[in-house]
Design a protein with these regions (language model features):
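Selective recognition of specific alpha-helical transmembrane segments in multi-pass small-molecule
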Residues: 1, 34-46, 111-127, 167-174, ...
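Membrane-water interface regions at transmembrane-helix termini and the short interhelical loops
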Residues: 5-9, 22, 30, 56, ...
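Hydrophobic alpha-helical segments and their helix-loop junctions in multi-pass secondary transporters
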Residues: 47, 51-60, 112-148, 171, ...
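C-terminal membrane-solvent junction of multi-pass transporters and transport-like membrane proteins
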Residues: 318-398, 402, 409-412
Length: 413
C-alpha cells in the first residue's frame, strides 16, 4: 500500500493516469478497465451481501417473513429486491458530493463498526460465561466451515498459516492498484505511513481477535460456528441486538464497497472517456452495471470464478507499474506528460508493448495456468498473485532496460 501510496502522494494522480507511465497513454485504459470490471462485479456482490443482512433482520417480523415468502420477481424474493435497491440507493447518496463525502462516511463507518462489534463480543462473552481465545470447536466442524476457503494444509499447520497469510495479502490486491486514488489526498508520506500502519496491521489484527472471540463465544452459547454477524443476529431473542448485528455487517460491507468497488471504476471509466464522463458519472455507470447484474446474481454462480481469474491479472499489472515507477524511473514522473497524447508516454502509438508482454506472461502464471491446467502444483493458485507480480516485474525490467539501452546506443550513433 505504501509503495503505491507514495506514488499517489508525489504525483497527485489517480490510478488510471499513473498507469499511463508504464502502459502508455492509451494502453492504460486496459488495466483501468480490468480493475473496473472486477469492481462492478463485486459492487453488486457486496450490495447483495449488505441487503441480505437487512433481510435477515426484517424476517424476524411475521409480516416481512410472509411478504418474503409470498413475493418473487427478478429471480429473488420481493423483500430481497427492495432491500437491494434501498442499499444500492444509499451508496449513491454517499458519493453525491464526490470524494469528500466518501471520506466523511469512512470517518463515521469505521468507528461505528468497531463499537458494534465490541458490543456483540461483550454480550456473547457475558452470556457464555467466559472470555477466551481458545475454542472447543471440533476439528471436523472447522474443516467443514473452511472447506470453500481454498486453504491447503491442515488447520494450524505452517502450510495453512502461510496460505492464509498469502490470501490476506491477495485480498487487498485490487486496492494495491488504485490506492493512489486515495493517497493523492494525503498531505505527505509520513501521514500516509501512519494511516496505513494503524489502518492495516494494527486494525486488522485487533479486529480479527475481536471477531475470533465473538465466534468462539457464539459457539459456546449456540453450539454452532457462526461466521457472520447476520448469522449471529438470527439467534438473538432481543430485536435490538439482532438489529445491531445486522447493521454491523451492513455498514462494514458498505464501507468496503464504497472504497474498493465504487471509487475505482468511477476514476477508471472517466479515464477511458474523459470528455464525456467525470468522477460522479463514472460511479453511476458502475452502480447501474451492478444493478443490471442483480437479476442474474452472477456472484452466486460460476461467473465468480471468471471474475477472480480476471482479478488475478492485477498482480502482473501491479508488478509492471511498481518496477517502472521505482526501478526504471526512480520515482520521477513527468506528470504533465501523463496528460499529453504526443509526449513521453506515447510509446508505440499510445501503447507500451513491452508492458503488455510482461503483464501477459505474468497473467499466464498467476491466472491461466493455475485455473485451466494441471501443469502447476495445487498450491500454486494460492500464491498466484505473488508469482504474477514477480514474473511480470522481472520480465518488464529486462525488456525495458534493454529498450532503453538500445535507444541510448542509437542516440550515440
Amino acid at each position: 500500500m505504501n509503495m503505491v501510496g507514495y506514488a499517489g502522494v508525489k504525483t497527485g494522480v489517480p490510478y488510471p493516469v499513473l498507469a499511463r507511465a508504464s502502459f502508455g497513454i492509451w494502453g492504460a485504459n486496459i488495466p483501468a478497465l480490468v480493475r473496473a470490471v472486477v469492481a462492478c462485479f463485486w459492487y453488486g456482490a457486496q450490495t447483495a451481501a449488505a441487503s441480505g443482512a437487512i433481510v435477515a433482520l426484517l424476517i424476524r417480523t411475521q409480516w416481512f417473513a410472509d411478504f418474503n415468502a409470498s413475493t418473487h420477481f427478478l429471480g429473488h424474493t420481493g423483500l430481497e429486491v427492495i432491500c437491494f435497491v434501498v442499499i444500492w440507493g444509499l451508496q449513491l447518496l454517499i458519493i453525491q458530493n464526490g470524494m469528500e463525502t466518501v471520506r466523511r462516511f469512512q470517518d463515521w463507518a469505521g468507528p461505528a463498526v468497531w463499537v458494534m462489534m465490541l458490543i456483540l463480543a461483550i454480550y456473547l462473552c457475558v452470556k457464555s460465561g467466559r472470555f477466551a481465545f481458545t475454542s472447543d470447536i471440533p476439528m471436523d466442524v472447522l474443516l467443514d466451515k473452511t472447506k470453500d476457503a481454498g486453504v491447503p494444509g491442515t488447520p494450524g499447520s505452517w502450510t495453512s498459516l502461510f496460505a492464509v497469510a498469502a490470501i490476506w495479502v491477495t485480498y487487498f490486491s485490487a486496492l494495491y492498484l488504485n490506492f493512489c486514488d486515495f493517497a493523492r489526498y494525503a498531505p505527505d508520506k509520513a501521514s500516509l505511513r501512519k494511516g496505513n500502519i494503524w489502518g492495516l496491521p494494527i486494525n486488522l489484527i485487533l479486529f480479527s481477535l475481536v471477531a475470533g472471540v465473538t465466534t468462539i463465544a457464539a459457539f459456546d452459547v449456540y453450539g454452532e460456528v457462526l461466521l457472520h454477524p447476520d448469522q449471529i443476529s438470527a439467534k438473538f431473542d432481543s430485536w435490538f441486538l439482532a438489529a445491531l448485528a445486522a447493521l454491523t455487517f451492513a455498514v462494514a460491507t458498505l464501507g468496503i464497497n464504497v472504497v474498493a468497488n465504487f471509487v475505482s471504476p468511477a476514476f477508471d471509466f472517466s479515464n477511458v472517456f474523459p470528455r464525456q464522463i467525470d468522477f460522479k458519472k463514472g460511479g453511476y455507470i458502475a452502480a447501474v452495471i451492478a444493478l443490471l447484474l442483480y437479476p442474474f446474481a452472477p456472484w452466486e454462480g460460476s461467473a465468480a470464478s471468471f471474475v477472480n481469474i480476471i482479478g488475478a491479472t492485477m498482480g502482473p499489472i501491479f508488478g509492471v507499474m511498481m518496477v517502472d515507477y521505482y526501478l526504471i524511473r526512480k520515482g520521477e514522473v513527468d506528470v504533465e506528460a501523463l496528460y499529453r497524447e504526443d509526449g513521453e508516454f506515447r510509446f508505440q502509438g499510445g501503447w507500451h508493448v513491452n508492458a503488455f508482454i510482461a503483464a501477459g506472461i505474468g497473467a499466464i502464471f498467476s491466472s491461466i495456468l493455475p485455473n485451466f491446467t494441471n501443469w502447476l502444483p495445487s498450491w500454486w493458485g494460492v500464491y498466484g498473485w505473488f508469482f504474477g507480480v514477480a514474473i511480470a516485474g522481472i520480465i518488464y525490467y529486462v525488456l525495458r532496460t534493454a529498450a532503453l539501452g538500445a535507444g541510448a546506443r542509437t542516440a550515440k550513433a
